[in-house]
């Protein structure tokens, strides 16, 4: 494994998500970084996109047997930082270790309109014990 501390932080996230690895997809900057590690990937002469977060695509419903996702995240040193006014609020799941700015965000497909019939925004939902942001086109992953 790479000695880069960012990879160690990412590994803690993956460890937390182990029971659901068949149901989740790593997207965004970390997907590009991981692709470079594949034996068939072409070596590139520039550094990969660096982000402080890992984006995790979740299905709208996830099978949970045993601990929920948040409990496993907390056991691996992550803590929820709630943002915004939505219900549930959007969240960054940050590592609590000093000096490590790494965090995870969860994203779920937006089904229907961004605003419901009664005027309530459909921006977030609770999935498997974590707050997930609803976004268009996540389902194509």
Task: Give names to the regions the model predicted.
Residues 1-141:
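Compositionally biased terminal segments of proteins
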């Amino acid at each position: 494994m790479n000695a880069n501390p960012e990879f160690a932080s990412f590994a803690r996230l993956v460890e937390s998500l182990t029971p659901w690895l068949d149901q989740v997809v790593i997207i965004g900057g970390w997907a590009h970084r991981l692709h470079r590690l594949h034996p068939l990937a072409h070596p590139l002469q520039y550094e990969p996109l660096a982000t402080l977060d890992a984006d995790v695509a979740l299905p709208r419903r996830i099978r949970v047997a045993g601990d929920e996702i948040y409990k496993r995240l907390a056991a691996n040193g992550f803590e929820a930082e709630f943002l915004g006014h939505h219900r549930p609020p959007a969240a960054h799941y940050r590592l609590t270790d000093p000096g490590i700015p790494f965090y995870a965000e969860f994203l779920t497909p937006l089904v229907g309109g961004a605003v419901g019939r009664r005027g309530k925004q459909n921006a977030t939902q609770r999935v498997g014990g974590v707050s997930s942001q609803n976004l268009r086109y996540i389902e194509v992953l």
